[in-house]
Amino acid sequence: MLKIIIPTMMLMPLTWMSKPNMIWINTTAYSLLISLISLSFLNQLGDNCMSLSLLFFTDSLSAPLLALTTWLLPLMLMASQFHLSKEPLTRKKLYITMLILLQLFLIMTFTATELIMFYILFEATLVPTLIIITRWGNQTERLNAGTYFLFYTLVGSLPLLVALLFIQNNMGTLNFLMIQLWAQPLPSSWSNTLLWLACMMAFMVKMPLYGLHLWLPKAHVEAPIAGSMVLAAVLLKLGGYGMMRITVLLSPLTNFMAYPFMMLSLWGMIMTSSICLRQTDLKSLIAYSSVSHMALVIMAILIQTPWSYMGATALMIAHGLTSSMLFCLANSNYERTHSRTMILARGLQVLLPLMAAWWLLASLTNLALPPTINLIGELFVVMASFSWSNITIILMGTNIIITALYSLYMLTTTQRGKYTYHIKNIKPSFTRENALMTLHLMPLLLLSLNPKIILGPIY
């Protein structure tokens, strides 16, 4: 594990010691190297886990998320170069340091062996994210967004700490590997219901569940590009990861308690997809589509069958790469037209034909077209929910249709139509941006050749 953690820590002195013209090249190259090293964790044997030390372990659930986290840092650095070009040197270095610190916390969160350590690191990821949003966001509303983000996630996760201390008292350990062997069945009673809610609420807010999702569109819209990317791609997955880990402790009770939350996520999935159809703001549309995809994941995790777990893991990885790519595309539009309003930046296909190709591919990935892993994840989830209850097929079908509608709506509004007068003389697409899109799409297409490495612990 140290072969990833120590190089990530060493990226910080590298950032501060690099020459001004070498900062981006150095950090991007070295972080890409770290992400290539982390791919070795994906090659794991069956359902056993690698206990790397007393503090860290990886298994087939945390390894794909670990690889996703490390893969994202070089992409964030590549995406941020343009909008930081006018910033003073110290501020650039501080920004990169924040991103590296966030990656460090995320890696340790996904591989922590012990639940209290997991909780501390889970909370620690808030700090760099908050600084990135409130310091480098575009509009003045970023402070409001930061407050929303902080309070929603903190209020949601404070009961979790109390619940964890209570479990520690009862069981004597919070080690993930021990818990699987020692977990006592949890009968339904008032106190256990509260315990269940305390354990799950933190992750439900983080996912976010429909109704607790108000912080997400705000945070996404106000964050700079790297903030949006890491928020959509990795921070939402912390919720899913935590839920999958902690359901071991709450085994029989979840069967009774999950119903209202499943209904809420099924309903929310359709609601947020419908909200996407009437968005005028491009980033806001992508943020709401994230909520709708994560509702599928919540649904899958609460069904608690091997198939649904596999679907949830695959969907988390697929969504991480897809939404990150969509945010990059939205940002490349924003850098040229200086507006996120879709009406003002239409007809770009004539001016940026290669970008239009990337937009098409990203939209098709978002609506789960066959060769991508988005389809594999969604198929698993749809089948699992159908075998749980036949009626869900109506809701799932509706959701899939609306998803296709808003993806194509997003594509046609930004690419088709007559372009507006003020964007005649925009810059062409850079090699940097094309490389960025390629690095997002490559894993999505390659993983469809061998999806079993991201299907989680059951496969």
Curated annotation (Swiss-Prot):
Catalytic activity as recorded in UniProt: a ubiquinone + NADH + 5 H(+)(in) = a ubiquinol + NAD(+) + 4 H(+)(out)
Pfam families reported for this sequence: Oxidored_q5_N (PF01059), Proton_antipo_M (PF00361)
One of the record's GO molecular function terms: ubiquinone binding
Domain of life from the UniProt record: Eukaryota
Keyword Transport: yes
Enzyme Commission number(s): 7.1.1.2
Matching InterPro entries: NADH4_N, NADH_Q_OxRdtase_chainM/4, NADH_UbQ_OxRdtase, ND/Mrp_TM
Example GO BP: electron transport coupled proton transport
Tagged with keyword Methyltransferase: no
Keywords: Electron transport, Membrane, Mitochondrion, Mitochondrion inner membrane, NAD, Respiratory chain, Translocase, Transmembrane, Transmembrane helix, Transport, Ubiquinone
Assigned GO CC terms: mitochondrial inner membrane
Cellular location(s): Mitochondrion inner membrane
Topology of this chain in the membrane: Multi-pass membrane protein
PANTHER family tied to this protein: NADH-UBIQUINONE OXIDOREDUCTASE CHAIN 4 (PTHR43507:SF20)
Similarity-based family: Belongs to the complex I subunit 4 family.
Chain's role: Core subunit of the mitochondrial membrane respiratory chain NADH dehydrogenase (Complex I) which catalyzes electron transfer from NADH through the respiratory chain, using ubiquinone as an electron acceptor. Essential for the catalytic activity and assembly of complex I.
Quaternary structure note: Core subunit of respiratory chain NADH dehydrogenase (Complex I) which is composed of 45 different subunits.
Name listed for the protein in its UniProt record: NADH-ubiquinone oxidoreductase chain 4
